[in-house]
């Protein structure tokens, strides 16, 4: 338990991440589960809090909901926890996509289809949906 608390003293971990770290250090699985249950009961481990902190970090980096969702899943958080945190978020993803586009490309319009496609690919690669990208670039596909 001391090792787990020492790890948590440095930074926040999700349950699965901490479990992985402890197993890597050579602790037995039943002992790790018991320690994690104790730490969770005492409030040292909270996946919701961990997910919310990661969400804030990704929003600060102007990542879209798709990229945030993928990053949270890689940290070992379950889908229900991820969706709860994303739903509870008061982030305006459309405005975030627009600010990301302005920062990356400036206020100048795209010159030609090749440049438009490059901008769309960039924003979609940052986790924004097509609707959010179209809004950010003021792009009408029927134009």
Where are these regions (language model features)?
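An alpha-helical, amphipathic repeat domain used for nucleic-acid recognition
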Residues: 1-143
């Amino acid at each position: 338990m001391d090792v787990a608390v020492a790890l948590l003293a440095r930074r926040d971990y999700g349950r699965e991440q901490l479990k992985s770290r402890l197993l890597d250090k050579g602790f037995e699985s039943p002992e790790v589960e018991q320690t994690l249950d104790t730490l969770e009961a005492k409030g040292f481990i909270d996946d919701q809090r961990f997910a919310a902190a990661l969400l804030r970090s990704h929003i600060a980096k102007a990542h879209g909901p798709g990229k945030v969702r993928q990053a949270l899943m890689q940290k070992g958080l379950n889908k229900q926890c991820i969706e709860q945190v994303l739903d509870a978020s008061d982030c305006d993803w459309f405005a975030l996509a627009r600010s990301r586009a302005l920062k990356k490309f400036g206020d100048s319009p795209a010159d030609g289809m090749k440049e438009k496609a490059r901008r769309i690919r960039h924003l979609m690669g940052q986790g924004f949906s097509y609707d959010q990208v179209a809004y950010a670039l003021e792009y009408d596909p029927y134009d």
